[in-house]
UniProtKB/Swiss-Prot annotation:
Belongs to the OprB family. GO terms for cellular component: cell outer membrane; pore complex. Its main location: membrane. This is Porin B. One of its GO terms (biological process) is monoatomic ion transport. Keywords: Cell outer membrane, Ion transport, Membrane, Porin, Signal, Sugar transport, Transmembrane, Transmembrane beta strand, Transport. The gene is oprB. Substrate-selective channel for a variety of different sugars. Could potentially facilitate the diffusion of diverse compounds, dependent on the presence of a hydroxyl group, but is presumably restricted to carbohydrates. Involved in the transport of glucose, mannitol, fructose and glycerol (sugars able to support the growth of P.aeruginosa). Facilitates glucose diffusion across the outer membrane. It is found in: Cell outer membrane. The lineage of its organism: Bacteria, Pseudomonadati, Pseudomonadota, Gammaproteobacteria, Pseudomonadales. Induction: By glucose.
Length: 454
């Protein structure tokens, strides 16, 4: 525990969303189509209109994700409180073969809006170092409106070649991973989480081209080119379309294997990839003259590029009494980053998910994940040098730079499939050495993640 001099009262209540869950639970007793538990949408089929639109090629969606978190013990500031953050996503997917007769062509448009505050910033991490992960993954990239997807995709040669162009993020296609957990270390593209200055995950978009080729059964290779433009991250540039501010390009390549295992054809997915950024990047230790920047105070040395690689593995390994829609799946992630320029130089993650654990709850799921995030040794070396130059060795001194090493995150959740349009996932998270700082107490956090489709 390292308390700030001033603490704030508990954050905004989340009772309205618990009421939403209660509405979903109680709706089964009513015949109202708008809240039918078996409907794909909370607001129903609009008298059959939505199904009619789907058949014509129009798929309109309004989705919501809300995440609450409360610190139960530990962290930098153990004054108990809660934080809530959320996201709305409004979009349309169009089958242009049905609409315009353009063979094997699709269009996607999505705007997002994020709100709220993050417990990691307010309680878990030392403000001088931060929490490397986040206990609320949906927070971040500016609490604002953004154009998140605006792309056209077309397939050729009976679907073997897939080309997508427009505005979208790298994690939509490369280093992709589900986002059922609430902790950031188990959600989405992990490259973007630890190399976020160049790899922009949802909800940020940039001009991009992705080409994917199915060269053998279950095997794919894809390459991409993404605009490297830091101005896209700015809160006021959520709908920026121009290329002003572009610094270079991010070039990822990835090999994908999607096997079906055993007599029950249990699905798996394995990804091996590499990225290269042509944009300049600051060295984490050296200055412009090749001397320790923490000693000289000069500008950091500018490197001409940045790179890294990743591995993602997901595999269902059992079914449940012969039902392949239920059963145990294993997952793992590994990312390795440029030691000259990246604060995090490597990350590992392991976990399990069991779908349909109980016959009475066949659509529920249970997940457990553990992650390790390692801070570049040169970052720690510079922090120690800065403290020596300043003559500071007292952690409580505001000018002290905390020494960062390794942060560990773990999460256990139970996903309640309330209806076909509402899932609620209460969870417990444990963070060891928040920010990789040994002086910060390990933190225990309770959370709840709500996902719904209107």
């Amino acid at each position: 525990m390292y308390k700030n001099k001033k603490t704030r009262p508990a954050a905004r209540t989340v009772g309205c969303l618990f009421a939403l869950g209660a509405l979903g639970l109680g709706s089964a007793a009513h015949a109202a189509e708008a809240f039918s538990p078996n409907s794909k949408w909370m607001l129903g089929d609009w008298g059959g209109k939505r199904t009619e639109l789907l058949e014509k090629g129009y798929d309109f969606k309004l989705e919501y994700v809300g995440e609450a978190a409360a610190n139960l013990d530990g962290g930098y500031d153990d004054d108990k409180t809660g934080r809530y953050t959320d996201q709305f996503a409004l979009g349309v997917h169009m089958d242009l073969e049905k609409i315009l007769g353009w063979k094997a062509t699709e269009f996607q448009f999505t705007v997002t809006e994020r709100n709220g505050k993050n417990l990691s910033n307010d309680r878990i991490g030392d403000p001088r170092a931060g929490h490397i992960s986040s206990v609320q993954e949906v927070w971040g990239r500016g609490q604002t409106w953004r154009l998140t997807q605006l792309w056209l995709k077309q397939q050729y040669f009976d679907g073997a070649l897939d080309v997508k162009f427009g505005r979208f993020g790298e994690g939509e296609d490369f280093n992709s991973f589900p986002c059922d957990f609430q902790n950031l270390a188990f959600c989405g593209s992990q490259v973007g989480n630890w190399a976020g200055s160049i790899w922009y995950n949802w909800p940020v978009s940039q001009w991009a081209l992705r080409v994917k080729y199915n060269f053998a059964p279950d095997w794919y290779v894809q390459v991409g080119a993404y605009e490297q433009n830091p101005s896209n991250l700015e809160t006021g540039n959520g709908f920026k379309m121009s290329g002003s501010g572009t610094k270079g390009a991010l070039l990822p390549v990835e090999l994908i294997w999607q096997p079906k295992v055993g007599a029950e054809q249990l699905p798996g997915e394995y990804r091996l990839g590499y990225y290269y950024s042509t944009a300049k990047a600051d060295d984490v230790y050296d200055d412009v003259d090749g001397q320790p920047q923490g000693l000289t105070g000069n500008d950091f040395k500018s490197r001409g590029s940045k790179h890294g690689w990743w591995v993602v593995a997901q595999q269902q390994v059992t079914s449940h009494n012969g039902d392949a829609s239920r059963g145990l799946s294993l997952f793992a992630n590994l990312t390795v980053h440029d030691k000259a320029t990246n604060v995090v130089d490597n990350y590992q993650q392991l976990g399990v998910v069991y779908k349909g654990p109980f016959d009475a709850r066949p659509k529920d799921d249970i997940g457990l994940g553990i992650a390790r995030i390692h801070v570049n040794d040169d970052v720690k070396k510079r922090q120690r040098l800065v403290n020596q130059v300043n003559g500071i060795d007292d952690y409580d001194n505001p000018l002290y730079q905390p020494l960062q090493d390794t942060e560990y995150n773990a999460e256990l959740y139970y996903g309640v499939h309330v209806t076909d349009w509402l899932t609620v996932r209460p969870n417990l998270q444990y963070i060891k050495q928040p920010g990789g700082v040994d002086e910060v107490d390990n933190a225990l956090v309770a959370g709840i993640k709500i996902q719904t489709v209107f």
